[in-house]
Amino acid sequence: MGRLYGVVEGSELLGFCAITTDQDDDYRAVWDISEMAIVPHRLAVHPSAHGKGVAKLLLERAEGICKERGYKSIRVDTNAKNRATNILFPKLGYESLRPITLTGKPKNMLFNTYEKYVA
């Protein structure tokens, strides 16, 4: 499963996110990747839409898909230096786990991991 979801206002794309079930092997350090989960990737919001709840809308859509499919959690990672998402995820109820490195990225580049359980 992998689809790109967007938030559009008029003819302007305000933000988008790939909503997948893809869990890279690197995630084994944090999660049991044999468990199905929703995994949003590439969450991006146009600067003109910052602070307008666009990222929240996209993550709420991910939650809806998670519930529809009967999965128990949403798992995300973000660059440890991405201040906005490292504030956003806990604010939306995501539990902060531990930083990991990702294959193909510099070893000194850390990615924070988060998980949210849905009912």
What are these regions (language model features)?
Residues V45, G51-G64, I87-K91:
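Conserved acetyl-CoA-binding loop-helix of GNAT-fold acetyltransferases
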Residues L14, R83-A84:
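Short alpha-helical
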Residues L59, C66-T78:
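Conserved GNAT acetyl-CoA-binding A-motif
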Residues M1-S48, L59-E60, Y117-A119:
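Acetyl-CoA-dependent GNAT
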Residues D77-T78, P90-L110:
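Conserved catalytic-core motifs of GNAT/GCN5-like acyltransferases
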